[in-house]
UniProtKB/Swiss-Prot annotation:
Keyword Repeat: no
Protein name: Large ribosomal subunit protein uL14
InterPro entries: Ribosomal_uL14, Ribosomal_uL14_bac-type, Ribosomal_uL14_sf
Gene: rplN
UniProt keyword list: Ribonucleoprotein, Ribosomal protein, RNA-binding, rRNA-binding
Species annotation: Prochlorococcus marinus (strain MIT 9303)
Keyword hit for Ribosomal protein: yes
A GO BP entry: translation
Length: 121
């Protein structure tokens, strides 16, 4: 579960390395799960890239350490909390996605992120 002040690694090549959650988008929501959109501040970025440090961005959560329970009864858990930066059209800002992503992103209409990911779990 991601909440305000949570740090996430960035799973794309947009230039940001770490982001900190500022707000979970939605009506009075406290926690974000896989597939939810958050507003975040870039805390660590690579030089000479499109995303700069202290920039406020939107991101979609693709992996969480918290256990994700599926309708089939399966549960899945990742090793880190990770997100992919998106633009206003909900398309990824980077051209590559690193690491596995959850299948729930396809149900939330983030098909571009799913197609860029090397593995969908």
């Amino acid at each position: 579960m991601i909440q305000q002040e949570s740090f996430l690694t960035v799973a794309d090549n947009s230039g940001a390395k770490r982001i900190q959650c500022i707000r979970v988008l939605g009506s009075n929501r406290r926690y974000a799960h896989v597939g939810d959109i958050i507003v975040a501040a870039v805390k660590d970025a690579m030089p000479n890239m499109s995303v700069k440090k202290s920039e406020v961005v939107k991101a979609v959560v693709v992996r969480t350490k918290a256990t994700l329970r599926r309708e089939t009864g399966n549960s899945i858990r990742f090793d880190d909390n990770a997100a992919v930066l998106i633009n206003e059209d909900k398309n990824p800002r980077g051209t590559r996605v690193f690491g596995p992503v959850a299948r729930e992103l396809r149900e939330r209409n983030f098909t571009k992120i799913v197609s860029l990911a090397p593995e969908v779990i």
